[in-house]
Amino acid sequence: MKTLLRIDSSARIEGSRSRRLGDALEARWRAGSPDGAVVRRDLAADPVPHIEATTIAGFFTPADQVTDAMRAATVLSDRLIGEVEAADALLITAPMYNFGLPSTLKAWIDHVVRIHRTVAYDGTTFRGLVTGKAAYVALAYGAGSYEPGGTLAPFDYAKPYLTHVLGFIGFRDIEVVGVEGTSGEEGAAAAALDAALKAIENLPSLAA
């Protein structure tokens, strides 16, 4: 059975445009995997704590030297990475907050991007270890003009960061869908959301 791991990060449980796009992407995934299962992790309802010094020490300490405290500090990271490894596809939904991502999503990333677990380093180059999986990203922007060439494009630290960090740990098939102007005039914001949803409807069924 195929599995989709869905990560939601908007602080808004209701009325979130990024979650709405995520619902549509999830529906397209289900069209291609009708018997599949969706594992959900809502970072607003159940925030992931930021990593601490002991967590970082546990990441970089050789296995035979890890202390009980380090082991306890990396239990959550092990669990989150296990969810990614067990899934056939990953769906992340996120709004842009102050040109970047919600801190809850960054905290999740800091637990998941981990040496020897999701990325290898041979002293010269890095190699992602999360391979053979598709990733889907739904982004919502309060303002407009973040498209390539737009006046706010240089301030988009959400899409480039997410695509780079996912690629860094091994994802190669990354589909990004976004909606802009969600904080603008109500009619224009609704039209932008409808256009983004229609674009998702026109996608082929998403691969697991």
Curated annotation (Swiss-Prot):
EC main group: oxidoreductase
Chain residues that bind FMN: 10, 16-18, 96-99
Reactions catalysed, as given in the entry: 2 a quinone + NADH + H(+) = 2 a 1,4-benzosemiquinone + NAD(+); N,N-dimethyl-1,4-phenylenediamine + anthranilate + 2 NAD(+) = 2-(4-dimethylaminophenyl)diazenylbenzoate + 2 NADH + 2 H(+)
Cysteines engaged in disulfide bonds, as pairs: none
Signal peptide interval: none
Record GO terms (molecular function): electron transfer activity; FMN binding; oxidoreductase activity, acting on NAD(P)H as acceptor; oxidoreductase activity, acting on NAD(P)H, quinone or similar compound as acceptor
Requisite cofactors: FMN
Enzyme Commission number(s): 1.6.5.-, 1.7.1.17
Cofactor mode of binding and number, as noted: Binds 1 FMN per subunit.
Keywords: Flavoprotein, FMN, NAD, Oxidoreductase
Function: Quinone reductase that provides resistance to thiol-specific stress caused by electrophilic quinones.
Family of the protein in this entry: Belongs to the azoreductase type 1 family.
Assembly and binders: Homodimer.
Listed name of the protein: FMN-dependent NADH:quinone oxidoreductase
